[in-house]
């Protein structure tokens, strides 16, 4: 059976030699959860936090073995803060959380302290998570734009970046697309479509 990663490479016309072996291992049959949600109602942090909580509950993901990957840290910082405040659950980040801004001045320090062994839901940019993997990966896709607010610039929306995110999963992938039109048709065709809103 052709893997999601190989299909992605074929559809977007590139080969990433660094991840080729990993792509061979990521057969669709090995995943217990390979789901896609298109959120076309705009980016709302409260709603996204609820959706992530629903995914964790419905799919039975262990938060200690789950990472939320985003294309940039702006959206991740807001969701992580909201998740932590609404659930009172521990989180681990590769960036400085909103309420720790004055304690640490450099995201590099957070990246160096990051480990998958720490207990809590992990939050990371795709770029910072290179070299790591997790049993459960929830990927947040953002709309392309000027890079301000929750939009991303084109350099963060390259197929190689999304491919890297896909290949971080050992077992389960859920993609929440928040208006990224470039990849919508591919994931809609190749993954199980699910709506976690109000569940």
Language model region names:
Residues 2-4, 8-11, 18-21, 26, ...:
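Core RecA-like ATPase module of SF1/SF2 helicases and allied nucleic-acid translocases
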């Amino acid at each position: 059976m052709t893997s999601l990663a190989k299909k992605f490479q074929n559809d977007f016309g590139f080969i990433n030699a660094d991840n080729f072996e990993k792509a061979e291992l990521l057969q669709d049959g090995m995943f217990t959860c390979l789901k896609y949600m298109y959120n076309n109602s705009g980016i709302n942090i409260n709603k996204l936090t609820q959706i992530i909580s629903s995914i964790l509950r419905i799919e039975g993901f262990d938060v200690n073995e789950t990472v939320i990957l985003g294309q940039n840290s702006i959206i991740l910082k807001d969701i992580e803060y909201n998740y932590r405040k609404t659930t009172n659950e521990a989180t681990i980040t590769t960036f400085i959380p909103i309420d720790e801004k004055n304690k640490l001045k450099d995201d590099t320090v957070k990246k160096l302290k990051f480990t998958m062994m720490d207990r809590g839901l992990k939050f990371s940019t795709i770029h910072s998570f290179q070299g790591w993997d997790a049993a459960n990966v929830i990927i947040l896709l953002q709309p392309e734009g000027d890079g301000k607010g929750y939009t991303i610039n084109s350099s963060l929306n390259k197929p190689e970046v999304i491919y890297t995110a896909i290949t971080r999963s050992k077992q389960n992938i859920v993609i929440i697309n928040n208006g990224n039109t470039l990849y919508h048709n591919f994931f809609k065709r190749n993954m199980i479509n699910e709506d976690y809103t109000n569940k």
